[in-house]
């Protein structure tokens, strides 16, 4: 089986599903460790090039794996292109509201809300780093195979021009959307720890997206760490069965201990 099969496998059941807004796509799934809390929290943002046909289900596998390591997970759904209000800025507004909902989760489930890591895969990596530019209280962010340069994603026509559908046009048509949404254009506070993991064998989002981001942001004085996994593809990073997963998991645990 390839790691892309993770998109189709039914995930382990969540402990709870809670709405953070009134739209049917404004909810998240909570998975808790079996031990006693308080637990650190990973808020996960799934990928799918911001399109409605890809939902949070496949990310349930990695969230379940992290809960076995003593970490509570908040697997977030958000409006996507094809949903009413999805795209920019609606998708990002949902992510921001889901992040701001975490203190309520903390009261209900005995979470350590001082230890929150926001993690995103592919398009979710863009949303995670964009969130870090707008929420200075967020001090841990991890992008897995992230779409971290939206102008370059447009130039390469990644996934049939997904970025044009997400932002509502090209860089010349909606330059303000690219400025607001592009992690490469934003500034993350220096106190925020950023980790990027990318597979050298990624044929969906090229690994140089993360490599270039790390180089440029380090040059601006941001706290950025980059790990490239030689044999990993795009989906290996979110598949707990893969050979790449232990490196993802150990990075999460390292960031939580920092």
Predicted regions and their residues:
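Glycine-rich nucleophile elbow surrounding the catalytic serine of serine-hydrolase chemistry
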Residues: 120-130
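Short beta-strand/loop motif that positions the catalytic acidic residue
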Residues: 190, 196-198, 202
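Short, surface-exposed "cap/lid" segments of acyl-processing enzymes
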Residues: 34-38, 42-65
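Short beta-strand immediately N-terminal to the catalytic nucleophile in serine-hydrolase-like folds
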Residues: 118-120, 144, 197
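Catalytic nucleophile-loop/oxyanion-hole region of alpha/beta-hydrolase
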Residues: 54-63, 74-115
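C-terminal catalytic histidine-bearing segment of alpha/beta-hydrolase fold enzymes
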Residues: 31, 204, 211-258
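Hydrolase active-site cap/lid region
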Residues: 130-174
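N-terminal cap/lid segment of alpha/beta-hydrolase-fold proteins
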Residues: 1-36
């Amino acid at each position: 089986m390839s790691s892309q099969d993770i998109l189709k496998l039914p995930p382990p059941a969540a402990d709870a599903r809670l709405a953070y807004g009134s739209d049917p796509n404004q909810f998240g799934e909570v998975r808790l460790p079996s031990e006693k809390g308080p637990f650190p929290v990973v808020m996960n943002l799934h990928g799918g090039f911001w399109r409605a046909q890809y939902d949070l289900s496949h990310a349930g596998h990695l969230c379940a794996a992290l809960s076995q390591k003593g970490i509570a997970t908040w697997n977030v759904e958000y409006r996507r292109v094809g949903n009413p209000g999805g795209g920019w800025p609606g998708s990002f507004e949902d992510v921001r509201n889901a992040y701001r909902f975490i203190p309520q989760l903390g009261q209900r489930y005995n979470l350590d809300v001082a230890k929150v890591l926001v993690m995103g895969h592919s398009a979710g990596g863009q949303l995670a780093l964009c969130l870090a530019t707008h929420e200075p209280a967020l001090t841990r962010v991890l992008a897995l195979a992230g779409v971290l340069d939206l102008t370059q994603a447009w130039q390469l026509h990644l996934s049939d021009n997904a970025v044009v559908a997400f932002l509502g046009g090209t860089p010349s048509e909606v330059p303000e959307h690219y400025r607001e949404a592009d992690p490469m254009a934003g500034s993350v506070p220096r106190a925020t720890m950023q980790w990027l993991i990318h597979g050298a064998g990624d044929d969906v989002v090229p690994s140089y997206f993360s490599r270039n981001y790390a180089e440029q942001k380090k040059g601006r004085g941001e706290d950025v760490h980059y790990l490239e996994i030689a044999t990993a593809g795009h989906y290996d990073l979110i598949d707990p069965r893969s050979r790449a997963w232990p490196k993802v998991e150990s990075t999460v645990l390292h960031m939580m201990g920092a």
